[in-house]
Design a protein with these regions (language model features):
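Glycine- and hydrophobic-rich flexible loops that cap the catalytic core of alpha/beta enzyme folds
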Residues: 2-189
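Histidine-centered nuclease catalytic patch
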Residues: 1, 373-377
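Short, compositionally biased pre-sequence/patch detector
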Residues: 364-365
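A cross-family structural signal marking well-folded subdomains
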Residues: 89, 107, 128, 136-360
Length: 377
């Protein structure tokens, strides 16, 4: 707000803004008698602090170098600038009058605590009565409250890595957190607005209180696998035909199968691939018979822990029969009735591509025998 005000004054030809400069930064003298420039506000993350210093010094880094935190600060700066331009246009007197009101009438309360954990607790309480925080914000605060001071830097870096990776991939952090909990802890029904209360009640089960940094490492490992799965790759980033086929069928909107894949990500690849193929077949049966994919929100969490305990294909067969195959059999009669009269123009583009690819593969197998089990398109 202050940087935008100062820069708006300058854009209107005003050069007298020493009072604003003094609020933004201060000059200090070090032990060698040298004057040093210090921004008054010290941000938690280095990248955000770098941008704030750039705003104060009028040396903003190139946009291509911005992180998500830096972009958020610039969005706030641009919003403030747009407000000044809209409300006061070129009227310097009115603009200065607003600044006078802001500085002299708006009171900022500074709360000092004896520890960061206590500060975070107060922050959580204040925001419970004001700005709403989602489960990710609250979880971050909770982890810092549980961590030793020596862990703060490690925790800060790990958390930023997690959130940035999800945002950079266009993935909603809350959805990932919900799917992670459903996949890992045997929960079968949990809404996004229930995540934080669930975590508080299950501290011992999850283990974040005893090892906050370790829990963030686990989240990062799961998020890396999750994002690779969304791209049709194995959790170590390698091409995976069975996963690619599922993702081609699922498109960008359907993600419930990620609950299963997160739960079984450490199984032997033969078992993991078999689960992928069964998930693909069930999804296709749902597509042909017009079933709502939201049913997977019920089925997959219910199956996740059972599937995660399987180590061999032999052990998987009876489980597959009582889960995926059982549900497919329930749809069998309708599937055989609907598939012959299915219209391609009734499908979305990505579903059309999937269907054509699978039909082409079936023709190749019928005409030439064994074909490559690689890509299905």
């Amino acid at each position: 707000i202050l940087c935008a005000y100062r820069d708006r004054l300058q854009a209107l030809g005003e050069t007298q803004h020493a009072a604003v400069d003094a609020l933004l930064a201060t000059q200090k003298v070090d032990d060698l008698g040298r004057e040093t420039f210090e921004v008054r506000l010290d941000l938690q993350y280095q990248d955000a602090g770098k941008l704030l210093t750039g705003l104060v010094e009028r040396k903003v880094p190139e946009p291509k170098t911005w992180t998500r935190s830096m972009a958020n600060i610039m969005t706030a700066y641009d919003t403030a600038t747009a407000f000044y331009e809209k409300e006061f246009k070129d009227d310097v007197a009115d603009l200065r009058k607003f600044f006078g009101y802001l500085i002299n009438r708006v009171k900022l309360i500074r709360v000092k605590t004896d520890s960061l954990a206590r500060a975070l607790k107060i922050f959580e309480t204040i925001n419970d009565r004001g700005v709403g925080l989602d489960a990710m914000d609250l979880l971050k605060n909770l982890l810092f409250m549980k961590a030793d001071k020596a862990e703060f830097q490690t925790l800060k870096v790990g958390w930023k890595k997690l959130v940035d990776a999800l945002h950079d991939a266009g993935e909603k952090p809350l959805r990932f957190l919900r799917y992670f909990i459903l996949s890992a802890y045997g929960e079968q029904k949990l809404r996004e607005d229930e995540l934080y209360s669930w975590l508080v009640k299950n501290e011992e089960k999850v283990g974040y209180g005893a090892d906050p940094a370790g829990f963030v490492d686990t989240l990062n490992e799961a998020a890396n696998a999750y994002l690779n799965f969304m791209s049709g790759r194995s959790q170590d980033g390698k091409p995976h035909p069975a996963l690619e086929a599922v993702q081609l069928l699922a498109g960008k909107a359907t993600r419930q199968h990620m609950i299963l894949f997160l739960a079984v990500r450490d199984l032997p690849d033969q078992v993991f691939s078999a689960i992928c193929r069964d998930a693909e077949n069930l999804m296709f049966a749902f597509l042909v018979t017009g079933q709502n994919f939201r049913e997977f929100e019920v089925l997959f969490p219910a199956w996740a822990q059972r599937l995660a305990s399987i180590k061999t294909l032999e052990a998987y067969e009876p489980v597959s029969a009582s889960t995926f195959n059982k549900r497919r059999q329930e749809l069998s009669e309708r599937f055989h009735r609907e598939f012959p009269v299915m219209r391609v123009d009734g499908l979305r583009k990505f579903q059309q591509r999937y269907l054509v690819a699978r039909l082409t593969q079936a023709v190749d197998q019928a005409g030439f025998g064994s074909t490559s089990q690689g890509h299905v398109w």
